Amino acid sequence: MPTNADLTMKIDLAVVMTGTYITTFSGGVPTSASISLIMAPYQIQLDFSGSGVNYASTLSMKLNSQEIMGYTMAMKYASDMKSVEQISGSVRMPPIRFDGWVNAQAMIVAMSDSTKRLDVAYLNSQMGVVVVQTSDDAQLGTLAFKLYTDPETGIKSPQVAVVYSDGSWEWLADILSGSGTKSSFTRWSQPR
């Protein structure tokens, strides 16, 4: 297995991308990896390390020197290494950041069980994630499951919402897709 590589991409003799890849293995299992790509004005850095059932990963994507997306996560796998039991850390999408933990395997099992998948109280007990406005490091609210009813079919399903500190809430998917209300974008970019 290759443990390192350097990459240079040229177009008409001009360097347009460079990259590096470095990894270590123990008994054929990767214990660390670092990947770096630069394609001006973008830079991407991805790192991964761990052993046993505990692993960590970081990602930073930058435009010039400004981070446009990133994460720092710790993952605990089940002893058989077939599933992730818990994820903790942060996901950064300036001007917001999500900090907290999720019991991933418990949520996957619950969502697969027709009797538990609509139990939003149980699903919410399996995560603790706060939403932070990054420039002031101010907590805006928390992530929580709410029941969504499809207007065409009437079928209910749990969906993630941002519950603001004043008790109001919006669907996370609407906010991230840009179809949330104007107030949601004001909340993300303005200090409260």
Write out the residue ranges for each language-model feature.
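Acidic/polar, low-complexity intrinsically disordered N-terminal segments immediately downstream
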Residues: M1, E152-R192
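Long, acidic/polar, low-complexity amphipathic helices and coiled-coil-like
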Residues: M1-T58
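Intrinsically disordered, low-complexity, compositionally biased regions/tails
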Residues: T23, A74, M93, W171, ...
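Short, surface-exposed secondary-structure junctions/capping segments
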Residues: A33-P41, K62-N64, I87, Q159, ...
